[in-house]
Amino acid sequence: MVALTEIKEYLRIPFDDEDTFIQAIIDAGYIYLENAVEYYHELYESNNSFSNLADFWVKTQWCPTAFDNREGMLAGNVQLSYTARSIITQLQLYTYKEGGE
């Protein structure tokens, strides 16, 4: 899981005023992936390339969009870019195999 400090560095946010909101955005990104990808938790725990791609998506696609468009996020109007949707599709194509990658 991507840390709050890592997201703040990526978004270039030097102050702590919005830490609670940024953490909520991070959490919402992972919840979004949980709902979009079958066997999300199993894949995240057992497959490094999957977890790296999921973290990359949260860091580079979800968090910047959510932070910049907070009014839309709060209203439930999520507009994902082509890149964000493509990465989700890649994550959805991973298959979970009991006992390994």
Regions found by a protein language model. Give the residues of each.
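Divalent metal-cofactor coordination and adjacent catalytic microenvironments
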Residues: M1-E101
